[in-house]
Amino acid sequence: MFALLSCIGISQTYVPDDNFEQRLIDLGYDIGPLDDNVPTTNINGVIDLDVDGLGILDLTGIEAFSALETFTCQSNNLTSLDLTQNTSLTQLFCGNNQLSNLDITQNPNLIILWCDFNQITSLDVTQNPSLISLRCENNLLTNLDVIQNPSLNVLVCENNQIASLDVSQNNTLSRFQCGNNLLSNLNLSNNPSLTFFTCENNQITSLDVSINTQLINLNCAFNELTELDISNNSNVTQLDCSNNNLCRLNLRNGNNGNITAMDFRANPDLNCVVVDNPSGNHSTWEPVSFSNYIASQNDCSNFVNVDTLDNVVTNISYTLPALINGNYFEQSGGNGIQYNTGDTITNSQTIYIYNETACDSNESSFSILIIEDDYYIPKYFTPNNDGRHDFWQVFDSNNSVKMTHIFDKYGKLLKSLTPNSQGWNGTFNGNPLNTDDYWYVVTLNSGEVIRGHFALKR
C-alpha cells in the first residue's frame, strides 16, 4: 500500500504510536489498518485536535499538523512533546503526563497553555507575549518568568519549588494561584484586577493587598505573616489566613456581612481582630471560640493579661510577691531595672508590672510608700477605676486609728471609715462626686483628733 501511495505521489507522515494512529483513524484522517503512516494531506490542514486519555506514549507525527491551533493531549503517558513545527498553535492542553521538558519558544501565538501535573523542571514563556492563561501547577519548576506576558489573566503555578515570582508586568491578572512553593515575598501592587488569589504554604512574611480592591477570594494560610489588612477589600467573601504568625488582623472593610467563609485559626499570638461591628454575629467564623473583636487596633492591649497589685503603705521593707502574668520593672514599658520575685524594696517608689506577647503588651503599676510614722494620710486620690489610687483611706501601720469621717466643704458627712475598710470611692448615695477638696476627721485610739483636707481628682 505504501509503495502504491508513493508511486502516485501521496506523502505520508510517520506515526509510530498505535494509540495515536488509531485516534487519527477514528477521526477519519486515515483509513487503516495500523501501519505507522498517515497521509500528510489529511492532517496538515487540521486546526483542532483532541487526543486526551488514550494511553499515548509517543506523539511523533504531530509536526505534520502545520495548521494546528488547538491541541489537547492531556492524561496520556507522554515523556516528551515536540511542537516546534506547530507555529500556528494558540491553545495547548498537555496536562497530566510525564513531561520533564516543554519547548514552546517556537509558538509565539499561544494564548492558553495548560501543562499542569507533569515533571517539568524549566518552562520558558518569554516568547509567548499573547499568553492569557497559564496553568503549570504540580510540576518541578524552580523559577518562572512571566514578565514578557503582559496579557496574562490566569496564572496557576502552585505546587512547584518556585522561590521568587515577579508579576509586576501582569496588570490584567485576575486569577493568581501560587500556593505550595518557596516564596518569601510577593508584590501585588500592579495587579488591581485580582479577584482570586491563593498563596498558601509558602514562607511569605508580608502581604499588602490594599490595591487589590476587586479581591473576592484570598487564601494566605500557612505562611509567616505578622499582619494582614483587608480594610480596602470590601468584595472579599472568603478569607483563610490560618496558621501564620499574625499579630494584627484588620477585617474592617465595611462589608463583613458579605463574608461567607473566614478562618484565622492557629495564630497563637493574635489577641484581637478589628471588625466592622465588635458585637456583631461572627458565629460562623473560625475559630468559633474567638470573641476578642474590636473596632480599633488601639484597643488590643487590653487583651494581654497582666497582674495587678494594690498600693502598699508600710513602715518596714516590702518583699515582691510571685507573679503569674508579667515581670517587675523600675520604669514603664519594661524599661529600667528588672526586679525579681522575692526582691526586698526599702525605699518608696512606683513599680511597674509589664507583660508582652510577640504582638502586644500591657502593664499595671502600684506604689510602695515606706513611712516612719504610725499612720499616713494621702493628699489626693483619683477614683477612675484604673486600679491606681481609686480609694482614699488612712494607712495605719500600727493600728492607731479608731475611726475616720469624711465631709464636704459644707460640713455634710459623706462617709465613715473603720480602720480595716477598703476606703472611700468618691461617691455619695451611689453617685460620683465632683473634683474638689474634701475634709477628714481622724480619731486615734489615744483620743487625739486630726483634721485636714485632701483632693478628689477625676
Name the predicted role of every residue range.
Residues 47-49, 71-73, 90-94, 113-115, ...:
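Conserved hydrophobic beta-strand positions in leucine-rich repeat
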Residues 54, 76, 97, 118, ...:
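Consensus "Asn ladder" position of solenoid repeat domains
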Residues 372-458:
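Short loop/turn motifs at secondary-structure boundaries
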Residues 7-70, 87, 106-108, 127, ...:
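N-terminal capping/linker segments that flank leucine-rich repeat
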Residues 46-53, 175, 326-328, 346-359, ...:
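Append "Rare intracellular matches occur via the same short Y/T/C beta-strand/loop motifs
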Residues 59-62, 81, 102, 123, ...:
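Canonical leucine-rich repeat
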Residues 337-354, 422-423:
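Solvent-exposed segments in extracellular or luminal domains encompassing
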Residues 301-330, 398:
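Solvent-exposed, low-complexity, repeat-rich "mucin-like" stalks and linkers
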